[in-house]
Amino acid sequence: MFKSILVATDGSELGEKSVSAAIELARAHGSKVLVLTSSDPVMTGVGSGGFGSFDAAPIIARLDEDYAAHAKQILAKAEENLSAAGISARTLHVPRTRPADAIIDVAKQEGCDTIVMGSHGRRGIGRLLLGSQAAEVLSRADIAVLIVK
């Protein structure tokens, strides 16, 4: 356990705390670290026919570009923090994918044995509640999950 850590971050305060927790685990166990962020799917049903419909493709393409640029910033900051701690890490942005799905799928594909993530993301409604994505990862993961508060 703790040999291959996937740390999920959305750039929020808890996302940054999750990266810090992954740093401590990696230091203690000599772990490999993969930093992941995902972008939610973009709704594509806008103007799907009938009177008044329009071509949403340019808007969706722009949203995808904006999400990718934001993900790049999030991952660069996490990588900088890991590097400053003497830990090399890989980074990955998974576009158009719900966070829980991205976390579970990538952890399996990469053979990770531990997931580190915040108790809730930017959409979280309170520090005492477990966010829906964290709850889903906990229920679906077959590896260790560290929830950071």
Feature map (PLM): residue ranges:
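Gly/Ser-rich helix-loop-strand patches that form or flank binding pockets
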Residues: E24, D105-K149
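Structural motif
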Residues: L36, L92-V94, V148
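Small/aliphatic-rich secondary-structure junction motif
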Residues: K3-P58, N81-R90
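Short, well-ordered secondary-structure micro-motifs
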Residues: S18, G45-S48, D101-I104, R127-L129
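Conserved residues at the C-terminal ends of beta-strands
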Residues: A8, P95, G118
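A short acidic, glycine-rich active-site loop
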Residues: D55-Q73
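Structural beta-alpha unit
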Residues: A76-I115
